[in-house]
Amino acid sequence: IRPANVYGPCSNPWTIRPIKLINSGQMILINKGIGLCNYVYIDNLIDATLSATKRDQSVGQVYLVSDGAAVMWKEFFGYYAQMARKPSIRSAPQWLAKVIGLGMEITSRFTGKPPKFTREAARFLTCQARFNIEKARHELGYQPRFSLQEGMKLTEQWLREAGYLPKEK
């Protein structure tokens, strides 16, 4: 199973880290967030994984797994901005993001600490690729149970319960 960007409860890279960056005002979109985000809600990934374990023909096969759609990063991270009650997320051009990434990569060589942002991250966040999950649909019977809207609603509930967002009154 090769999952897209896994979001939902306990996902550090695609849930916890973005909400922390948005809450602190440090989140920045690249090129206005028009790159494509391929995503999968954690429960959808679990469904696909369990389905693969039940089929002998899946042994040795590669299955791309996502929620079956891609959205621009500005929409994906926009859900988190709404949850955090932040009106918008700032943007920087790709060339600037790459320069910043290079600077952080060089600095990390001297500090021994991993860079917080890299040129590869800048490329990733501006990519226009889409996951094709037809093989998983056909061979595993995979069908995402949760849409992005449903997954984000459940994620918001978890973020509030876990203390990453204030509890609603």
Label each residue range with its predicted role.
Residues 37-43, 71, 131, 146:
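Residue-level signal for the nucleotide or nucleotide-sugar donor/cofactor binding architecture
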Residues 19-30, 113-116, 134:
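A short C-terminal helix-loop "cap" of Rossmann-like NAD(P)-dependent dehydrogenase/epimerase domains
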Residues 11-17, 31-53, 60-64:
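Substrate-positioning beta->alpha
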Residues 117-133:
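Active-site loop of classical SDR/Rossmann-like NAD(P)-dependent oxidoreductases
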Residues 1-9:
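Conserved beta-loop-beta element that borders a ligand/cofactor-binding pocket
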Residues 51-116, 133, 149, 153-156, ...:
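Mid/C-terminal beta-alpha module of Rossmann-like enzyme folds, strongest
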Residues 8, 30-35, 63-70, 81-84, ...:
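Glycine-rich Rossmann NAD(P)(H)-binding loop
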